[in-house]
Every structure is written in C-alpha cells, then in structure tokens.
C-alpha cells in the first residue's frame, strides 16, 4: 500500500491491487497546490471548500460522501457518521469517517469535531493506519486527537489538518500532538510504501506535497 500526503486532509492511497483512492480534495483558496489527479475513488468527509473540491479531477471516478458500506473495484469502504463539532452537527454539520479495508485497514477521520463514541469505534473495527486531524479550531485539538488515537489504537498514526507555512487560516501546530508520543518518525518525503506494520505504535510525520 502506498500513501501520499498531498496536503491538509488530502491523501492519495494506492492499494496493493492498484486502486487509487483520494481523500478530501481541497480548492486553491486553502493555500496549497491543487493537483490534477485521476483517482478511481474519491472520499469526501463533508462539503466544505477544503475537503470536497472535485473540480480539478480527471477521468471517471466513484464519489463516496455518505455513511454506509461500499465496495469499489474490490476495495471495501465503510462510511461512519460523526460530527464536525461537539454539538451534534448544530454548528458545522456532519462529518464522515471512512475506513478503507485492503491489506491494511486505513481510517481517515475527516474534520472530526469530537472524541469518538463507543458505537462509532465499534463500527470502525480494527484500524492499522489512522489519518487524524490534530490542529483544533474546526476539529479535535491535539489533546483530543491523542485521546482518539489511544481509543482507536492503530499501529501507524499519520497527523493531518494542522498549521503550515502555506495554509491560509489558523490551526494548531502538529508538535502539540506529537509531544504526547515517544516513537515519532519525521520523514523527508510526502510518500510512503507500507508493506509491514511496526511491532509498536508509531507516529509518522509526512511532508506535504502541495
């Protein structure tokens, strides 16, 4: 499995069989480079400009933007309803957590605004790789993200949705999240290929491509 961190909450995930899955594409108002991609599947956690922009995408793709269980090109995908805030969606609406089931199970939390409830964790099932927002303001903050990561208990944690030099609005820094962990690998690349899981939990901090 290959995972490329484009920027913000957007990743391009390529499964062992070659299926390309794009998560939460953003528009150019965010500050990052917008890429012209040709994915097979696009997952959007909600409709905001920084998570649901599909205008630059090419070719035919399957869009998944709701809760439920889906199978696309042999890849199983679960969408689990959560909220973008701590007020059951009254402030910012719903958010979909996606779990991609392939050789490894990858969970993308979108703009999760609250700590996960027991029934949501049960629906997610076993997660190997967790893509988690950590910057607060519009999502869970660093401490809440630590609590969520502890509850999900994956082998690999990849932070997303935090302040960078290019981002045009304020979020918390990723260091506020990583300081809670002992095993942190800072990578000088936006792309990783995962063939095996580490024996112990590890935070992997990727560079963003955009």
Where does each model-flagged region fall?
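Divalent metal-coordination and catalytic microenvironments
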Residues: 13, 42, 77, 111, ...
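Conserved beta-strand hairpin/beta-sheet module of binuclear metal-dependent hydrolase folds
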Residues: 1-30, 91-110, 129
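Active-site metal-binding motif and surrounding structural segment of the metallo-beta-lactamase
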Residues: 27-69, 122-131
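Active-site environment of divalent metal-dependent phosphoester hydrolases
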Residues: 28-31, 47-52, 114-117, 137-141, ...
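Active-site metal-binding loops of divalent metal-dependent hydrolases
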Residues: 25-27, 46-47, 82-84, 110-114, ...
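Portal/gating segments that form or line small-molecule/metal binding sites
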Residues: 54-107
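Active-site-proximal loop/helix segments of hydrolase catalytic cores
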Residues: 86-152
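Binuclear metal-ion centers of metallo-dependent hydrolases, dominated by the metallo-beta-lactamase
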Residues: 4-6, 91, 156-210
């Amino acid at each position: 499995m290959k995972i490329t961190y484009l920027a913000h909450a957007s990743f391009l995930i390529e499964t062992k069989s070659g299926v390309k899955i794009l998560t939460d594409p953003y528009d150019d108002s965010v500050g990052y480079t917008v890429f012209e991609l040709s994915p097979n599947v696009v997952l959007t956690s909600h409709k905001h400009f920084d998570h649901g922009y599909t205008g630059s995408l090419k070719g035919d793709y399957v869009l998944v933007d709701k809760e439920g269980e889906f199978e696309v090109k042999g890849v199983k995908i679960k969408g689990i309803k959560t909220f973008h805030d701590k007020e059951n969606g009254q402030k910012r609406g719903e958010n979909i957590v996606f779990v991609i089931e392939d050789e490894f199970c990858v969970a993308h939390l979108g703009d999760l605004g609250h700590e996960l409830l027991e029934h949501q964790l049960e629906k997610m099932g076993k997660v190997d790789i967790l893509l988690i927002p950590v910057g607060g303001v519009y999502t869970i903050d660093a401490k809440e993200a630590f609590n969520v990561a502890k509850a999900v208990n994956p082998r690999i944690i990849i932070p997303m949705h935090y302040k960078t030099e290019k981002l045009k609005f304020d979020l918390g820094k990723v260091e506020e999240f990583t300081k809670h962990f002992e095993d942190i690998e800072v990578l000088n690349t936006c792309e990783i290929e995962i063939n095996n899981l580490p024996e112990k939990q590890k935070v992997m901090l990727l560079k963003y491509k955009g």
